[in-house]
A protein has these predicted regions:
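A mid-to-C-terminal "edge-of-domain" accessory segment
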Residues: 4-9, 260-544
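Active-site beta->alpha loop and helix N-cap motifs at the rims of alpha/beta catalytic domains
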Residues: 48-130, 146-158
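Catalytic cores of alpha/beta
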Residues: 160, 212-224
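Active-site-adjacent beta->alpha loops and helix N-cap segments on the catalytic face
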Residues: 59-63, 121-137, 152-155, 180-194, ...
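Hydrophobic faces of well-ordered beta-strands that scaffold small-molecule active sites
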Residues: 6-9, 42-46, 78-85, 115-116, ...
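N-terminal small/glycine-rich loop or linker at the start of catalytic domains
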Residues: 2-20, 76-91, 136-149, 194
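Alpha-helix-loop-beta-strand connector modules within alpha/beta enzyme cores
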Residues: 57-82, 132-143, 188-205, 254-256
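Conserved small/polar residues in nucleotide/adenosyl-binding loops
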Residues: 549-554
Length: 557
């Protein structure tokens, strides 16, 4: 019998890889007991990545959600883990050091055991401080290697980085195969190399199923010493998400590994409940193409979760490109033609930009450059004329060192614009900021929260936190949800009037007792806006305001 392999359910990433939003706290506390009852998970990914920000976007408190979701697993002896972007922490741009340090204190207090720390550039200067901060806070820092496939991303390249991260105190290494394009043979060899050099270090493999290599990769890393495998479950496994725990268990058991049994009754209950969450509201924000695998992803190397946004980008420029071609008497392009052009351009620009691993946010930067290049080429203009500031920051070294060399034409372009390349510690560009946020909370009369968690949330996601506190976020989300629901019904053949009738079917009309002017809300920033059809009101909740016109008061009104 071979070694024991444990499983981690990446419940958070299942959702992030499928769509825009995460389940609400009331849904999470319902699914947690079923995940525990399945009996096959040593770990569960509960938060991090976009989880906290998404809660704010629909007007909920992420701190309550994290505490409520982690508690059942803690009680059951199951470890919880979160995703952490190193210098960028829980957002898409750099975070001051004092805010990063506070994050680990807060998340440990909220019940999170492990933080998976990654940097899209595999820049150790962005990861090592987080290892130190996590250890100080009592968390387990799992240092991460972002896996991709290129001439510079060799076994020795990754093993050398792993050596540095382990020396800095990381007791665990994650192989984060975010696009699923890591070649199985290379991943097996890398796992073996790390284990030979550091036999006591735990290795956890995280791979996406989009291009179709993930099962072979899982088998290779397990044969070479991996300890834990990230898995998903139906109805959200496969596609561009992750392999299903049932398939992984069957494959590994057949090869002689010790793997846990799965309580299939609990699995089916959890499967049905997750589908219930999709049907409730989350499905409206899920891109159906994320349920499809695609070998095309091997060519461009982009994460499968980006396909939805990439197709939306292409659809947005498709008609404009064809208008340009039509004006030149050239044949128009189908959306598939355009997709192949974009993939080819990604393949062209990626090495010239220094082979940044194609993971958030650098995958977006490379994709955006490629898309802009395609548009410029169609117009008969030159490449590289539309590079945004964030991409320039990456090129110039402000996010850390690129794995490969920049092309001479990129270096010359930077010099022609008067830009300077830097090689300083990226954190040095972002001074401490907690005192400013404390001042803002004091001025607003806001509580810092248990373990300073509210202070942390403002400092990490300031704009979204302010919108959450003001109520703007919840209203915006409700409006967005109604729009996507209406759009879904229209796709199914309902007219706008039919949708209104359906929403009003069980409603009783409210008759105003007097004539006057209706004000739906008192707004100091904009016009009075009617509530969306279907909004529910509680007893004694204000429905609207009326300015009454009477003969005695007419002059005043």
């Amino acid at each position: 019998m071979k070694k024991e392999i444990k499983f981690s359910l990446v419940y958070r990433d299942m959702w992030q890889s499928s769509g825009k939003y995460q389940p609400r706290v009331d849904q999470l506390v319902r699914i947690a007991p079923l995940i525990i009852e399945m009996g096959c998970f040593a770990r569960v990914e509960t938060n991090g990545g976009a989880f906290e920000q998404v809660n704010l976007l629909y007007g909920e408190n992420p701190n309550k959600a994290v505490r409520a979701f982690t508690q059942p697993f803690k009680d059951a002896g199951i470890q919880t883990h979160m995703l952490d972007r190193g210098l960028n922490a829980l957002r898409m741009y750099p975070v001051p050091a004092d805010v990063r340090r506070l994050m680990y204190k807060v998340k440990h207090a909220q019940g999170v055991d492990i933080t998976r720390i990654f940097c899209g550039l595999n820049e150790t200067r962005n990861i090592i401080p987080s290892i130190r901060y996590a250890l100080e806070a009592g968390m387990i820092p799992q240092a991460t290697l972002c896996i991709t496939h290129s001439p510079v991303h060799t076994v020795e390249y990754y093993a050398r980085i792993a050596d540095q991260l382990i020396e800095a105190g990381a007791p665990e290494i994650c192989l984060k195969d975010m696009a699923g394009i890591g070649r199985p043979g290379m991943l097996g060899e890398l796992t073996k190399t790390i284990k030979e050099r550091h036999p006591d270090v735990l290795i956890q493999y995280h791979g996406h199923s989009g291009p179709g290599l993930s099962m072979a990769s899982i088998l290779e890393v397990c044969e070479n010493g991996a300890d834990i495998i990230d898995v998903a479950m139906e109805p959200m496994s496969w596609g561009k998400v992750h392999p299903d725990v049932i398939s992984v268990q069957a494959m590994l058991r057949d090869k002689g590994f010790q793997v846990p049994d799965i309580n299939m009754k609990a699995y089916m209950k959890a499967r049905a409940m997750t589908q219930e969450f999709i049907d409730d509201f989350l499905g409206y924000f899920m891109d159906p193409t994320n349920k499809h695998m695609s070998s095309l992803l091997l060519k461009c190397g982009l994460p499968g979760g980006m396909m939805g946004s990439m197709m939306a980008d292409l659809k947005g420029v498709h008609s404009g490109i064809n208008m340009i071609l039509k004006g030149k008497n050239q044949p128009e392009l189908s959306i598939d033609d355009l997709l192949v052009m974009l993939f080819d351009e990604v393949e062209y620009v990626w090495p010239k930009l220094g082979y940044p691993p194609l993971v958030t946010p650098f995958s977006q930067y490379v994709k955006n450059v490629a898309l802009m290049n395609v548009m410029q080429l169609v117009k008969g203009e030159e490449r590289w004329t539309m590079i945004d500031n964030h991409t320039w920051d990456m090129i110039l070294g402000k996010s850390g060192r690129l794995p490969g060399e920049l092309a001479p034409e990129i270096i010359e372009l930077a010099k022609s614009k008067g830009y300077e390349f830097v090689d300083t510690d990226p954190q040095s560009n972002y001074p401490d900021a907690l005192d400013d946020y404390r001042k803002e909370m004091d001025e607003n009369g806001w509580e810092y929260g248990e373990d300073d968690e509210e202070l942390f949330e403002l400092a990490m996601h300031d704009r979204q936190y302010r919108d959450y506190k003001s109520g703007v976020a919840k209203k915006r989300f409700q409006d967005e949800l109604e729009r996507v629901k209406d759009a879904s019904m229209m796709k199914n053949g309902y007219s706008e009037e039919e949708i209104k009738k359906l929403k009003r079917a069980k409603a009783d009309p409210i008759i105003a007792p007097s004539k006057g002017q209706v004000l739906w809300e008192v707004s100091v920033e904009g016009p009075s806006a009617a509530p969306f059809i279907g909004r529910k009101y509680q007893h004694d909740e204000v429905f609207c305001y009326c300015l009454l016109y009477t003969s005695d008061a007419a002059d005043d009104l």
